[in-house]
Protein backbone atom coordinates (compact mmCIF):
# COMPACT_ATOMS: atom_id res chain seq x y z
CA UNK A 1 0.00 0.00 0.00
CA UNK A 2 1.12 3.53 -0.71
CA UNK A 3 -1.46 5.07 1.62
CA UNK A 4 -3.30 3.92 4.70
CA UNK A 5 -4.90 7.24 5.57
CA UNK A 6 -7.00 8.33 2.61
CA UNK A 7 -10.61 9.54 2.63
CA UNK A 8 -13.48 7.40 1.40
CA UNK A 9 -14.09 7.24 -2.36
CA UNK A 10 -17.35 9.18 -2.25
CA UNK A 11 -15.55 12.00 -0.42
CA UNK A 12 -12.81 11.93 -3.05
CA UNK A 13 -15.40 12.12 -5.83
CA UNK A 14 -16.93 15.21 -4.22
CA UNK A 15 -13.48 16.80 -3.85
CA UNK A 16 -12.60 16.12 -7.48
CA UNK A 17 -15.89 17.61 -8.72
CA UNK A 18 -15.57 20.63 -6.45
CA UNK A 19 -12.07 21.30 -7.78
CA UNK A 20 -13.30 21.24 -11.39
CA UNK A 21 -11.07 18.28 -12.24
CA UNK A 22 -12.60 16.64 -15.28
CA UNK A 23 -10.24 13.71 -15.86
CA UNK A 24 -8.96 11.31 -13.21
CA UNK A 25 -6.50 8.45 -13.47
CA UNK A 26 -6.55 5.61 -10.96
CA UNK A 27 -4.16 2.68 -10.99
CA UNK A 28 -6.58 -0.21 -10.50
CA UNK A 29 -10.29 -0.89 -10.97
CA UNK A 30 -11.44 -0.81 -7.36
CA UNK A 31 -15.24 -1.22 -7.36
CA UNK A 32 -15.76 1.30 -4.54
CA UNK A 33 -13.97 3.96 -6.57
CA UNK A 34 -15.81 3.12 -9.78
CA UNK A 35 -19.11 3.29 -7.90
CA UNK A 36 -18.21 6.62 -6.30
CA UNK A 37 -17.65 8.24 -9.69
CA UNK A 38 -20.89 7.01 -11.24
CA UNK A 39 -23.25 9.69 -12.51
CA UNK A 40 -20.53 12.34 -12.43
CA UNK A 41 -19.09 14.11 -15.46
CA UNK A 42 -15.57 12.94 -14.60
CA UNK A 43 -13.78 10.83 -17.20
CA UNK A 44 -11.90 7.96 -15.60
CA UNK A 45 -8.71 6.21 -16.69
CA UNK A 46 -8.54 2.86 -14.87
CA UNK A 47 -5.58 0.53 -14.56
CA UNK A 48 -4.44 -3.07 -14.61
CA UNK A 49 -1.77 -3.48 -11.94
CA UNK A 50 1.64 -4.91 -12.78
CA UNK A 51 0.96 -7.74 -10.35
CA UNK A 52 -2.04 -8.80 -12.46
CA UNK A 53 -0.29 -8.96 -15.83
CA UNK A 54 0.49 -12.67 -15.51
CA UNK A 55 -3.20 -13.44 -15.01
CA UNK A 56 -4.01 -11.18 -17.98
CA UNK A 57 -2.20 -13.61 -20.28
CA UNK A 58 -5.44 -15.63 -20.17
CA UNK A 59 -8.24 -14.43 -22.45
CA UNK A 60 -10.92 -16.02 -20.29
CA UNK A 61 -9.52 -14.25 -17.22
CA UNK A 62 -9.57 -10.88 -19.01
CA UNK A 63 -13.10 -11.51 -20.33
CA UNK A 64 -14.20 -12.23 -16.78
CA UNK A 65 -12.38 -9.14 -15.44
CA UNK A 66 -14.12 -6.88 -17.96
CA UNK A 67 -17.48 -8.51 -17.27
CA UNK A 68 -17.17 -8.28 -13.46
CA UNK A 69 -14.92 -5.27 -12.82
CA UNK A 70 -15.74 -2.79 -15.60
CA UNK A 71 -19.08 -3.45 -17.29
CA UNK A 72 -21.23 -3.31 -14.12
CA UNK A 73 -20.14 0.34 -13.66
CA UNK A 74 -20.12 1.43 -17.29
CA UNK A 75 -21.40 3.76 -18.72
CA UNK A 76 -22.78 5.29 -15.48
CA UNK A 77 -19.10 5.69 -14.58
CA UNK A 78 -17.46 7.30 -17.59
CA UNK A 79 -14.48 4.98 -18.10
CA UNK A 80 -12.54 6.21 -21.14
CA UNK A 81 -9.14 4.47 -20.90
CA UNK A 82 -7.60 1.29 -19.53
CA UNK A 83 -3.89 1.33 -18.74
CA UNK A 84 -2.26 -2.10 -18.83
CA UNK A 85 0.66 -2.15 -16.39
CA UNK A 86 2.75 0.83 -15.35
CA UNK A 87 6.27 1.49 -16.65
CA UNK A 88 6.71 -2.25 -17.19
CA UNK A 89 8.78 -1.86 -20.34
CA UNK A 90 11.51 -0.11 -18.34
CA UNK A 91 12.37 -3.17 -16.31
CA UNK A 92 14.02 -5.06 -19.20
CA UNK A 93 13.12 -8.40 -17.66
CA UNK A 94 10.79 -11.18 -18.75
CA UNK A 95 7.79 -9.30 -17.34
CA UNK A 96 8.03 -6.74 -20.14
CA UNK A 97 6.90 -9.46 -22.53
CA UNK A 98 3.60 -9.71 -20.66
CA UNK A 99 2.38 -6.24 -21.65
CA UNK A 100 1.45 -6.61 -25.33
CA UNK A 101 -0.25 -10.03 -24.95
CA UNK A 102 -2.23 -8.64 -21.99
CA UNK A 103 -3.29 -5.65 -24.12
CA UNK A 104 -4.30 -7.95 -26.97
CA UNK A 105 -6.59 -9.79 -24.57
CA UNK A 106 -8.04 -6.50 -23.32
CA UNK A 107 -8.78 -5.46 -26.92
CA UNK A 108 -10.41 -8.77 -27.63
CA UNK A 109 -12.60 -8.49 -24.51
CA UNK A 110 -13.57 -4.90 -25.44
CA UNK A 111 -14.47 -6.04 -28.98
CA UNK A 112 -16.68 -8.76 -27.57
CA UNK A 113 -18.48 -6.05 -25.58
CA UNK A 114 -18.45 -3.75 -28.64
CA UNK A 115 -16.57 -1.10 -26.66
CA UNK A 116 -13.26 -1.00 -28.56
CA UNK A 117 -14.09 2.43 -29.99
CA UNK A 118 -15.28 3.91 -26.70
CA UNK A 119 -12.61 2.73 -24.25
CA UNK A 120 -9.00 3.27 -25.33
CA UNK A 121 -6.09 1.26 -23.97
CA UNK A 122 -2.32 1.57 -23.75
CA UNK A 123 0.56 1.12 -21.30
CA UNK A 124 2.32 4.08 -19.64
CA UNK A 125 6.10 4.14 -20.14
CA UNK A 126 8.74 6.24 -18.44
CA UNK A 127 11.05 8.54 -20.35
CA UNK A 128 13.80 5.94 -19.79
CA UNK A 129 12.73 4.31 -23.07
CA UNK A 130 14.18 7.36 -24.87
CA UNK A 131 17.89 7.80 -25.52
CA UNK A 132 19.30 11.02 -24.04
CA UNK A 133 18.79 13.28 -27.06
CA UNK A 134 19.77 16.84 -27.85
CA UNK A 135 18.42 18.66 -29.72
CA UNK A 136 14.88 17.17 -29.71
CA UNK A 137 14.95 16.52 -33.47
CA UNK A 138 17.63 13.88 -32.77
CA UNK A 139 15.15 12.04 -30.54
CA UNK A 140 15.28 8.25 -30.74
CA UNK A 141 14.21 5.33 -28.59
CA UNK A 142 16.89 3.54 -26.63
CA UNK A 143 18.10 0.44 -28.46
CA UNK A 144 18.00 -1.44 -25.12
CA UNK A 145 14.20 -1.54 -25.38
CA UNK A 146 13.98 -2.44 -29.06
CA UNK A 147 12.68 -5.98 -28.54
CA UNK A 148 9.67 -4.81 -26.59
CA UNK A 149 9.12 -1.42 -28.27
CA UNK A 150 8.77 -2.77 -31.80
CA UNK A 151 5.74 -4.99 -31.06
CA UNK A 152 4.31 -2.37 -28.70
CA UNK A 153 4.44 0.47 -31.26
CA UNK A 154 2.98 -1.77 -33.97
CA UNK A 155 0.18 -2.77 -31.59
CA UNK A 156 -0.62 0.83 -30.63
CA UNK A 157 -0.69 1.88 -34.28
CA UNK A 158 -2.84 -1.06 -35.31
CA UNK A 159 -5.43 -0.16 -32.66
CA UNK A 160 -5.14 3.65 -32.92
CA UNK A 161 -4.12 3.67 -29.27
CA UNK A 162 -2.22 6.56 -27.70
CA UNK A 163 1.42 6.43 -26.63
CA UNK A 164 1.41 7.02 -22.86
CA UNK A 165 4.46 8.47 -21.14
CA UNK A 166 5.38 9.73 -17.66
CA UNK A 167 7.51 12.90 -17.89
CA UNK A 168 9.21 14.53 -14.92
CA UNK A 169 11.30 17.64 -15.67
CA UNK A 170 11.86 17.75 -11.89
CA UNK A 171 14.42 14.96 -12.26
CA UNK A 172 16.37 16.94 -14.87
CA UNK A 173 16.60 19.65 -12.22
CA UNK A 174 17.42 17.22 -9.44
CA UNK A 175 20.25 15.70 -11.51
CA UNK A 176 21.70 19.15 -12.12
CA UNK A 177 20.94 18.95 -15.84
CA UNK A 178 18.99 22.17 -16.10
CA UNK A 179 18.19 25.62 -14.76
CA UNK A 180 15.21 26.03 -12.44
CA UNK A 181 13.54 28.69 -14.62
CA UNK A 182 13.66 26.37 -17.64
CA UNK A 183 11.99 23.58 -15.69
CA UNK A 184 9.34 25.76 -14.02
CA UNK A 185 8.16 27.37 -17.31
CA UNK A 186 9.60 30.70 -16.10
CA UNK A 187 12.03 31.44 -18.92
CA UNK A 188 10.68 34.28 -21.05
CA UNK A 189 13.26 33.71 -23.78
CA UNK A 190 14.38 30.71 -25.77
CA UNK A 191 16.61 28.25 -23.90
CA UNK A 192 17.91 26.72 -27.12
CA UNK A 193 17.31 26.61 -30.86
CA UNK A 194 17.23 23.19 -32.52
CA UNK A 195 19.84 23.51 -35.25
CA UNK A 196 18.12 20.92 -37.43
CA UNK A 197 14.69 22.52 -37.42
CA UNK A 198 15.32 26.15 -36.42
CA UNK A 199 12.68 25.73 -33.70
CA UNK A 200 13.25 27.41 -30.35
CA UNK A 201 12.13 26.00 -27.01
CA UNK A 202 11.69 27.81 -23.71
CA UNK A 203 10.94 24.99 -21.25
CA UNK A 204 12.15 21.48 -20.48
CA UNK A 205 8.69 19.87 -20.55
CA UNK A 206 8.24 20.78 -24.24
CA UNK A 207 11.78 19.69 -25.01
CA UNK A 208 11.21 16.27 -23.41
CA UNK A 209 7.89 15.86 -25.20
CA UNK A 210 9.38 16.80 -28.57
CA UNK A 211 12.17 14.24 -28.10
CA UNK A 212 9.35 11.67 -27.93
CA UNK A 213 7.52 13.23 -30.91
CA UNK A 214 10.66 12.92 -33.03
CA UNK A 215 11.46 9.42 -31.75
CA UNK A 216 8.00 8.34 -32.92
CA UNK A 217 8.35 10.22 -36.21
CA UNK A 218 11.69 8.53 -36.91
CA UNK A 219 9.83 5.22 -36.63
CA UNK A 220 7.03 6.43 -38.94
CA UNK A 221 4.54 6.84 -36.10
CA UNK A 222 4.29 10.63 -36.29
CA UNK A 223 0.48 10.54 -36.18
CA UNK A 224 0.35 8.59 -32.94
CA UNK A 225 -1.34 10.59 -30.16
CA UNK A 226 0.61 11.10 -26.95
CA UNK A 227 -0.86 11.26 -23.45
CA UNK A 228 1.39 12.39 -20.60
CA UNK A 229 0.01 10.07 -17.94
CA UNK A 230 2.09 11.56 -15.12
CA UNK A 231 4.00 14.74 -14.42
CA UNK A 232 4.35 16.70 -11.22
CA UNK A 233 6.61 18.18 -8.58
CA UNK A 234 7.27 17.09 -4.99
CA UNK A 235 6.98 19.44 -2.01
CA UNK A 236 9.57 17.79 0.27
CA UNK A 237 12.65 15.61 0.13
CA UNK A 238 15.24 17.42 -2.02
CA UNK A 239 16.72 20.93 -2.37
CA UNK A 240 14.34 21.69 -5.27
CA UNK A 241 11.31 20.02 -3.71
CA UNK A 242 9.22 22.76 -2.12
CA UNK A 243 5.65 23.94 -1.94
CA UNK A 244 6.62 27.07 -3.85
CA UNK A 245 8.27 25.19 -6.72
CA UNK A 246 5.47 22.59 -6.90
CA UNK A 247 2.83 25.30 -7.05
CA UNK A 248 4.80 27.21 -9.70
CA UNK A 249 5.42 24.12 -11.86
CA UNK A 250 1.84 22.86 -11.82
CA UNK A 251 0.27 26.32 -12.17
CA UNK A 252 2.48 27.16 -15.15
CA UNK A 253 1.97 23.70 -16.64
CA UNK A 254 -1.81 24.17 -16.51
CA UNK A 255 -1.50 27.59 -18.13
CA UNK A 256 0.84 26.20 -20.80
CA UNK A 257 -1.55 23.37 -21.67
CA UNK A 258 -4.70 25.49 -21.60
CA UNK A 259 -3.22 28.31 -23.67
CA UNK A 260 -1.74 26.03 -26.31
CA UNK A 261 -0.38 25.80 -28.91
CA UNK A 262 1.19 22.38 -28.34
CA UNK A 263 4.98 22.02 -28.45
CA UNK A 264 7.43 23.78 -30.81
CA UNK A 265 7.68 20.78 -33.14
CA UNK A 266 4.01 19.75 -32.93
CA UNK A 267 2.19 23.05 -32.42
CA UNK A 268 -1.22 21.80 -33.54
CA UNK A 269 -1.28 18.75 -31.27
CA UNK A 270 -3.50 19.21 -28.23
CA UNK A 271 -1.60 18.48 -25.04
CA UNK A 272 -3.20 15.87 -22.76
CA UNK A 273 -1.45 15.84 -19.40
CA UNK A 274 -2.19 14.24 -16.01
CA UNK A 275 -0.73 15.85 -12.89
CA UNK A 276 0.61 13.42 -10.32
CA UNK A 277 -0.87 13.23 -7.79
CA UNK A 278 -4.11 13.94 -5.99
CA UNK A 279 -2.83 12.90 -2.53
CA UNK A 280 0.50 12.49 -0.77
CA UNK A 281 1.41 8.81 -0.30
CA UNK A 282 2.60 8.16 3.22
CA UNK A 283 3.71 4.54 2.67
CA UNK A 284 5.37 4.81 -0.75
CA UNK A 285 8.85 3.28 -0.88
CA UNK A 286 11.97 5.19 -1.90
CA UNK A 287 13.20 8.74 -1.27
CA UNK A 288 11.05 11.22 0.65
CA UNK A 289 10.17 13.03 -2.58
CA UNK A 290 8.19 9.95 -3.68
CA UNK A 291 5.75 10.42 -0.79
CA UNK A 292 5.20 14.12 -1.41
CA UNK A 293 3.85 14.71 -4.92
CA UNK A 294 0.28 15.26 -3.69
CA UNK A 295 -1.67 18.47 -4.09
CA UNK A 296 -3.96 17.46 -1.19
CA UNK A 297 -3.34 16.04 2.24
CA UNK A 298 -5.34 12.95 3.24
CA UNK A 299 -7.73 15.18 5.20
CA UNK A 300 -8.53 16.82 1.83
CA UNK A 301 -6.97 20.18 2.70
CA UNK A 302 -4.72 21.65 0.02
CA UNK A 303 -0.96 21.25 0.21
CA UNK A 304 -0.95 24.42 -1.91
CA UNK A 305 -3.50 26.32 -3.93
CA UNK A 306 -3.92 25.11 -7.51
CA UNK A 307 -6.66 26.45 -9.73
CA UNK A 308 -8.15 24.04 -12.23
CA UNK A 309 -9.70 26.13 -15.01
CA UNK A 310 -12.59 25.20 -17.22
CA UNK A 311 -11.92 27.17 -20.36
CA UNK A 312 -13.88 26.52 -23.50
CA UNK A 313 -14.90 23.07 -22.38
CA UNK A 314 -11.34 21.92 -21.66
CA UNK A 315 -10.63 20.86 -18.11
CA UNK A 316 -7.88 19.31 -16.13
CA UNK A 317 -6.49 15.86 -15.34
CA UNK A 318 -5.16 14.37 -12.12
CA UNK A 319 -3.43 11.06 -11.54
CA UNK A 320 -4.34 9.57 -8.19
CA UNK A 321 -2.25 6.61 -7.12
CA UNK A 322 -5.41 5.45 -5.52
CA UNK A 323 -8.63 7.16 -4.75
CA UNK A 324 -8.80 5.26 -1.50
CA UNK A 325 -6.87 2.76 0.63
CA UNK A 326 -6.80 -0.18 -1.75
CA UNK A 327 -4.31 -2.95 -2.34
CA UNK A 328 -1.93 -1.19 -4.70
CA UNK A 329 1.61 -2.07 -5.58
CA UNK A 330 2.74 1.47 -5.12
Residue ranges and their predicted role:
Residues 10-16, 28-38:
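Internal amphipathic alpha-helical repeat/solenoid segments
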Residues 22-33, 43:
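General structural concept
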Residues 6, 60, 93-100, 199, ...:
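Soluble non-cytosolic domains of exported or imported proteins
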Residues 1-23:
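Boundary/entry segment of secreted carbohydrate-active catalytic domains
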Residues 13, 104-108, 117-123, 129-130, ...:
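Substrate-binding and catalytic surfaces of secreted/luminal carbohydrate-active proteins
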Residues 22, 80, 222:
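Short acidic/polar active-site loop segments enriched in Thr and Asp
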Residues 24-27, 85, 166, 276:
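Conserved residues at the C-terminal ends of beta-strands
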Residues 34-144, 228:
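Substrate-binding cleft of extracellular glycoside hydrolase catalytic domains
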Amino acid sequence: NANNNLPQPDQVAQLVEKQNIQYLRIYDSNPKVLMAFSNTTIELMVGVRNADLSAFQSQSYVDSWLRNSILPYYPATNITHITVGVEMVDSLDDATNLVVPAMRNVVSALKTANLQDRIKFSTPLSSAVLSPSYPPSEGVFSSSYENVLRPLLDFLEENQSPFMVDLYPFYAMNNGDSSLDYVLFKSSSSIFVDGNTGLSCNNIFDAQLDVLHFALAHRNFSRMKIIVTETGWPTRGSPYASIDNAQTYNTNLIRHVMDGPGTPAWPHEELVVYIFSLFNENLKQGPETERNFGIFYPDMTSVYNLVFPDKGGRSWCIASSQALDSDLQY
